């Protein structure tokens, strides 16, 4: 007879961030326990790792220390950098334990807008787990009082509405946009650049960003003008906590935040009716994809790869992924989640949750480059300068950001050019 040790479960480490609030950590802990109890082969140890940026740092540190995590919920725009630096496994290393290639699974089962961020140079390195786009949250009760009939469809309408909603005597603001350098600022800024008709980065080549461009200058000027010229938004760097607090206390008309915050926004909008709409357009309607994907770090054993595959397929199964979507407000990247009876009932009961899906036809990949975090912060830190000071010009800000980003990407660019690029 086999001893107990021979029948022991394969143990794997699973790192996950909770970008919204403490409830997500509790829910993920429940999902892990449910998986562990459901089968005899795998024992998953969940490790909560803070936000997206710290999750990347902790996963890389664990790998360097010889304890690579078998599975990590990683910000979807980190896949490129991790793959180029040879830190993560191509997903086929896990999918060889199943009956199809990772790329086929990705293309068949997931919304097309998710594909680009999951693949690097044609190889699938990630499987989407939960996704978001920025959306416009608005206080419908305040809209009604101000005589605003529908959410703004264009930047001009957004500004006109924000003016009607601003009341300095009450400390009430028309709109707030997050401008923090934790990816929120850059994400929302990229949405404005795209809506203004521009491209934010080269989607096919990780060594190019387009910070110093007319569309980026225009988006930055629009943002700065909302504060200093139109006076419909407070000055300084605003974080998502400040914005949601102002919104819940009835002191804010509109906010551009993630669909991933829908559950949180719904729960806390108690004294008024919460409205949700697509982001307004300027030259075009456009939003970036956000959220996170599952990646697997190099250095794990074959047994751990097999175990990781089992847990991964569980996490993205229509039932589990759909339930996570309903709990959080992130949309499920797995198309079949929306065929489940629970999801159909949920969308019927709260149509606001369908906005992110409707926006998918206007979605584009999340910016991802070589050294993506530092390259992102180059622009975000200039965004901070612009919102902090009316005298900082958008032109100077994008020039400084471009210079810093180019210097950061230079090693990759030189390697591609086969020579030093001056």
Segments (PLM) and residue ranges:
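Extracytoplasmic/periplasmic substrate-recognition and gating elements
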Residues: 38, 146, 217, 221, ...
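Hinge/lid segment of periplasmic solute-binding proteins
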Residues: 76-133, 185-188, 275-277, 344-345, ...
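Extracytoplasmic "Venus flytrap"
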Residues: 12-30, 49-50, 132, 183, ...
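Short, solvent-exposed loop/beta-turn-alpha elements that line the ligand-binding surface or hinge
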Residues: 92-109, 179-180, 196-218, 267-269, ...
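Short, well-ordered beta-strand elements
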Residues: 9-20, 42-47, 71, 173
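Extracytoplasmic "Venus flytrap"/periplasmic binding protein-like
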Residues: 30-109, 141-153, 246, 253-254, ...
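Glycine-centered hinge/linker elements that transmit conformational signals in sensory
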Residues: 161-163, 168, 205-236
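Long, aromatic- and glycine/proline-rich binding clefts that accommodate carbohydrate-like moieties
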Residues: 106-109, 270, 274-277, 326-381, ...
């Amino acid at each position: 007879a086999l001893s107990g040790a021979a029948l022991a479960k394969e143990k794997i480490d699973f790192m996950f961030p909770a970008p919204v609030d403490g409830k997500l950590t509790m829910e993920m802990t429940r999902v892990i326990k449910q998986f562990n109890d459901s089968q005899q082969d795998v024992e998953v140890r969940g490790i909560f790792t803070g936000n997206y940026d710290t999750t990347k740092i902790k996963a890389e540190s664990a790998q360097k220390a010889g304890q690579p995590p078998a599975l990590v919920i990683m910000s979807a725009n980190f896949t490129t950098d991790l793959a180029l630096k040879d830190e993560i496994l191509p997903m086929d290393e896990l999918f060889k334990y199943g009956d199809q290639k990772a790329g086929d699974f990705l293309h068949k089962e997931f919304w097309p807008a998710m594909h680009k961020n999951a693949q690097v140079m044609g190889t699938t390195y990630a499987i989407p787990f939960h996704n978001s786009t920025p959306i416009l949250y608005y206080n419908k009760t305040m809209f009604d009082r101000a005589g605003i009939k529908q959410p703004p469809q264009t930047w001009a309408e957004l500004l006109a509405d924000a003016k009607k909603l601003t009341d300095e005597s009450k400390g009430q603001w028309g709109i707030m946009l997050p401008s923090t350098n934790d990816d929120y600022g850059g994400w929302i800024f990229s949405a404005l650049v795209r809506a203004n008709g521009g491209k934010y980065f080269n989607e096919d080549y990780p060594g190019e960003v387009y910070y110093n461009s007319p569309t980026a200058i225009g988006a930055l000027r629009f943002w700065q003008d909302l504060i200093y010229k139109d006076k419909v938004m407070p000055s300084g760097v605003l974080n998502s906590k400040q914005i949601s607090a102002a919104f819940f206390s009835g002191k804010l008309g509109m906010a551009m935040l993630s669909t991933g915050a829908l559950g949180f926004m719904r729960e806390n909008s108690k004294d008024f009716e919460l409205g949700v709409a697509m982001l307004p357009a300027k030259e075009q309607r456009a939003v970036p994809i956000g959220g996170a994907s599952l990646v697997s770090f190099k250095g794990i054993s074959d047994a751990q790869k097999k175990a990781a595959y089992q847990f991964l397929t569980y996490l993205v199964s229509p039932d589990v992924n759909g339930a996570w979507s309903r709990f959080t407000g992130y949309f499920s990247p797995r198309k079949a989640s929306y065929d489940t009876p629970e999801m159909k009932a949920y969308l019927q009961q709260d149509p606001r949750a369908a906005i992110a899906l409707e926006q998918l036809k206007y979605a584009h990949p999340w910016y991802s480059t070589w050294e993506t975090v530092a390259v992102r912060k180059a622009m975000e830190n200039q965004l901070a300068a612009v919102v902090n000071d009316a005298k900082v010009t958008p032109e100077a800000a994008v020039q400084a950001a471009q210079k810093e980003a180019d210097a950061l990407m230079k090693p990759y660019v030189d390697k591609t050019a086969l020579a030093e690029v001056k």
